[in-house]
Design a protein with these regions (language model features):
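Carbohydrate-recognition beta-sandwich/jelly-roll modules
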Residues: 4-305, 338, 342-345, 426, ...
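Active-site-adjacent "subsite" loops/lids of carbohydrate-active enzymes
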Residues: 331, 337, 345-419, 504-519
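C-terminal beta-strand-rich structural cap/linker in extracellular carbohydrate-active enzymes
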Residues: 681-705
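The substrate-binding groove and active-site-proximal loops of carbohydrate-active enzymes
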Residues: 264-287, 314-329, 393-411, 445-459, ...
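Short, acidic/polar
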Residues: 281-296, 408-420, 543
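Acidic/aromatic-lined carbohydrate-recognition and catalytic surfaces
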Residues: 306-380, 459-482
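Active-site-proximal substrate-binding groove within the catalytic cores of carbohydrate-active enzymes
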Residues: 205, 216-222, 456-675
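Active-site neighborhood of glycoside hydrolase catalytic domains
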Residues: 400-493, 507
Length: 705
């Protein structure tokens, strides 16, 4: 027997025995797999600092009171009652969790409700970084991660390493959409995990903030389950309709003019090689590489944004103190002056909201300052009051800054001010805060509740805004950026970031560019995981493939360099291994960036949309080190709608050979490739793309009066 919600087309069935989801059907198609329970709670024992997990199966008494489901009778806390109000609004099933009679020694820390499972064979969209379609072994065996202390890259936390607050699972026609309808963008874990019967659990764990300290608590927003026809892009359209009215997407400052010229981002370290070490390399003094940069600019026919890694005076990745640059301020400023006079830009990496107490790779230490100034009182604390930091702990020993504490904000802004005053155009100071992630803090004497929650999102948004205003006050309004794509509530404030490829987990499904391209154009990034993920020698065109995919997503192009001046596979590649073949990469990038500048109304200012022209082409086998190969189209494509309503679809042949492709279109179009323009009628067409080339399909458009 079951409780049924919904209508004839879209139906939810719950177990009468324990309230678990048994079935979700859409137009007669089953979208879900049976779940064993409805919820998981993580309670915080505030006297001891321990966690206590509760599963729905531990509450033997279950009943329904109209729209409200209630669980109670736990043997350790008989009065403790968990509730969920379920409604159907014609489009979504809405779940509103609540707690009553919470035991006095506990605070509500995390709530996962409902527990939603899907069959293993479904394609699963996971919002890790830009978004990905998760693959094995992660799909079947991913561990159950939770937001917590200290911060690390394992759990997918929103807003942060999770860029949006929805997941999706779909088959050949229909799919399931699972999201938090939370306009405050509070902290959540956006995860998956193995479930019973060859199924996967789509997991949204919500934090409780100050309200979690009460004995009665209701989550202030709904979790929603909807259905769609199509794939991950159609799921994105649901989220886009919700997000476009969010006032957080409004930007209150002008973007710098140099973004209009689409500089190619050239990334390299001035210390170490593919490994992080403190020894200077051949990129120092800074001016030494200027001749090579001039050559690259000429070969690409483009201005450059030179983005330096491991430049900080105290050694690579030793926050929060960076200035002056390693190699000397005089050399650095001379280099900046040369770049600016040649029409280029300069950017720097930072290392986020972290504090280094001691380096593990050389003799740098701040232990004396830390002790004498009593800085520990400003640091983020764990559930037992401990201080720690796990991120980059192989490089440094340290702690995390609590960004509600004025001293921590001041030290971040002080570094931004120094960098801005010296003419830098872009500062990725939130590297290691993936997507702008703010770290959990349980301190009871800081300027926030002693539980994770929406205060973290608000504090990070305020920090980003304060850093930006600090830079603007110097007369140099440099851009602030983060590692990976900026998560949704920070997109407007950080429109230019170092996108990271989620290839280690699955095939990229770039929801961030799809949803937010008109607000933010990220760049391909330093691709630090490429070498450890891709068998580069066995997939020699893989860098060209990555450039092509970046271009059709509307991103700025970027390369990393070795100190030989060669373009590399990525920032962490082995410099003793052969570099990529150079000329094909440069030829392709020049073609793509010329198109990017010519069609900036699409590729810089446009809204990404689902391609209307269907392409049939061959497949490229991308050979990977730790999982099965990915097979990706030999002709990547992406479609955009310009602000004036005109539409275009871009395509790329990234290999050094002609590539046949068949196009199916419901309307006529004009194909432009280089200097060639050819008109095609609606229907099916066959053509051959030249080697290392890009093209655009243009559709007739009547402008509105």
């Amino acid at each position: 027997m079951s409780y049924t919600f919904g209508n004839q087309d879209f139906q939810l069935r719950l177990s009468e025995r324990n309230g678990a989801i048994k079935s979700i059907t859409f137009h007669g198609t089953e979208l879900a797999a049976p779940s064993t329970g409805m919820f998981t709670l993580r309670m915080y024992l505030h006297e001891t600092g321990d966690y206590r997990f509760f599963q729905a199966e531990e509450f033997p008494k279950f009943r329904r009171e109209g729209e409200l489901l209630l669980w109670s009778g736990h043997p350790e806390a008989p009065e403790f009652t968990v509730g969920c109000r379920i409604t159907f609004d014609g489009e979504f099933f809405r779940f509103r969790p609540s707690l009553r009679h919470v035991p006095g020694e506990m605070w509500a820390d995390l709530i996962e409700m409902p527990q939603l499972c899907v069959p293993l064979e479904k394609e699963i969209f996971w919002p890790h970084g830009p978004g990905c379609l998760i693959r094995e072994p992660w799909k079947s065996f991913r561990e159950y991660h939770h937001a917590g202390f200290p911060g690390n890259s394992d759990p997918c936390v929103y807003p942060g390493s999770a860029s949006v607050q929805f997941l999706a699972a779909y088959g050949s026609r229909y799919g399931l959409y699972y999201a938090a309808d939370d306009p405050t963008h509070s902290i959540k874990t956006m995860e998956i995990g193995p479930a019973a019967g060859s199924s996967v659990r789509l997991r949204i764990e919500c934090t409780c903030d100050r309200q979690g300290m009460e004995q009665e608590f209701e989550l202030p927003f709904d979790l929603v389950v909807g259905a769609f026809e199509g794939d991950w892009m159609d799921a994105c359209e649901i989220y886009r309709r919700w997000m476009k009215h969010d006032p957080i997407m409004k930007r209150d400052f002008a973007l710098p003019d140099w973004m209009e010229e689409s500089p190619v981002v050239i990334i390299y370290p001035v210390c170490g090689d593919g490994r992080i070490t403190p020894e200077p390399n051949r990129f120092l003094p800074y001016e030494r590489n200027f001749t090579r940069l001039k050559e690259l600019s000429a070969a690409l026919d483009s201005p450059l944004l030179v983005l330096l890694m491991r430049w900080d005076h105290n050694g690579p990745w030793m926050p929060p103190y960076y200035w002056p640059p390693v190699g000397g301020e005089e050399s650095f400023l001379t280099f900046c002056d040369k770049l600016h006079k040649a029409g280029h830009r300069i950017g720097l990496y930072g290392s986020g909201t972290l504090y280094t107490r001691k380096s593990r790779i050389h003799d740098y230490s701040t232990e004396e300052e830390y002790r004498k100034r009593g800085l520990e009182r400003f640091m983020a604390r764990g559930p037992k009051g401990e201080v720690d930091a796990r991120i980059c702990s192989n490089i440094r020993q340290g702690t995390e800054l609590c960004i509600t504490e004025p001293w921590c904000v001041d030290v971040m802004c002080e570094q931004v001010k120094l960098v801005a005053e010296h003419g830098v155009d872009f500062f990725q100071i939130l590297d290691q805060n993936h997507g702008g992630e703010s770290f959990v803090c349980y301190a009871r004497d800081h300027h926030h509740p002693p539980l994770p929650g929406v205060w973290q999102t608000r504090a990070m948004a305020k920090l980003i805004e304060t850093m930006r205003r600090t830079a603007a006050a110097t007369g140099n309004p440099l851009l602030i950026g983060c590692e990976n794509v900026a998560a949704a509530p920070y997109v407007a404030q950080m429109p230019f970031n170092d996108r990271r490829n989620p290839l280690v987990y699955g095939q990229e499904a770039n929801a961030v560019q799809y949803l937010f391209h008109e607000y933010a154009n990220n760049f391909l990034g330093n691709e630090s995981s490429a070498w450890e993920t891709i068998r580069c020698a066995d997939s020699p065109d893989n860098l060209q493939l990555r450039l092509a995919m970046s271009f059709v997503r509307g991103e700025y192009l970027s390369f990393t360099l070795r100190d030989s001046g060669e373009i590399d596979w990525g920032a962490a590649a082995d410099w003793s291994a052969p570099a990529p073949e150079q000329q094909p990469v440069l030829t392709l990038a020049k073609q793509c960036n010329a198109f990017r500048r010519k069609y900036r109304k699409f590729l810089l200012h446009g809204t990404m949309q689902k391609p209307s022209v269907r392409l049939e082409c061959g497949w490229y086998e991308l050979k990977l080190r730790k999982r099965d190969s990915e097979f990706l189209p030999l002709v990547p494509t992406g479609a955009f709608r310009a602000p004036d309503g005109e539409e275009a679809q871009f395509l790329v042949n990234f290999r050094n050979r002609p590539e046949p492709v068949r196009l199916r279109s419901d309307r006529p179009f004009t194909l432009e490739t280089g200097e060639s323009r050819t008109q095609f009628p609606a229907g099916e067409s066959a053509l051959e793309l030249p080697p290392l080339s890009c093209g655009v399909l243009l559709f007739s458009h009547e402008k509105e009066d």
